[in-house]
Amino acid sequence: MGRLFVYDENMTDERAKITVAKMAAVSDIVASEKAFIQYSAAGQLTVLAGAVIAVGDAIFQTEETTLSAANLDGASSFAHGKDYYIYLCDNGKDSSNEVYLISENSTFPDGVEWDDTNTRKIGGFHYGFVRNVDEYGREVNTSGSVRGSGWESNVREDIAPNSVWTALHRPKCDPSGMAYLGNGLWADIYLASDDGANGLQSVYNATPITGTEGLIWLCNANFSNFGNCDNMG
């Protein structure tokens, strides 16, 4: 369906008509399914139809759309160990539908025409090693045997299916480098490492926090507002 509202002073375009149904649907993001972006095939995601999304002063209603590396804002392929962010973009033309871009940028996509006023981050995912499983989600080896010899190394590079998040289906914290385990639980994909800003992160190929950093690092990172570390017992 694309652009849900347009300006037409003669009201001949159906999209210019404000109806009770339209107004009832419009808020920040409205979707019948919170996970309105889903893994659908190797290297592909599907945006489900019917989500209503505001971008600046424009409002769009999604059609079922397949996203892939072709939607990247610069590169031609996904890179191993990277987090990607999915944007719905408005080019400002009433005759045009929404534009989907995938970017490593967490603010807005690359391109002189895009900024934080005409793009909306609606989801994201992590790209890396994914274990091959059968239709029931059980780990298999290259011969298809459940937990058969060598199953541990039977992996592929792909979008991690349970890392896909949306603005409505995500953890309360930054979802980068995380995966959904079910029952409302999200977890880091990688062992926690120092983000360089007195916090932790889940990123590929980083040195994990080992515990040998000691209490001093912990105090500086998390307890700077609670007095001297010597008083912590």
Task: Label each region the model flagged.
Residues 132, 136, 141-143, 164-233:
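Short aromatic-cysteine micro-motif
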Residues 103-159:
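Polybasic, proline/glycine-rich intrinsically disordered low-complexity segments
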Residues 1-19:
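Short, intrinsically disordered N-terminal pre-domain segments
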Residues 85-89, 186-188:
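Residues within well-ordered beta-strands of beta-sheet-rich folds
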Residues 15, 92-109:
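Short, surface-exposed terminal/edge motifs of secreted or surface/virion proteins that either
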Residues 16-83, 92:
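Glycine-rich, flexible loop motifs
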Residues 33-53, 113, 158-179:
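Carbohydrate-recognition beta-sandwich/jelly-roll modules
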Residues 90-97, 191-197:
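Acidic glycine-/aspartate-rich tracts in secreted/extracellular proteins
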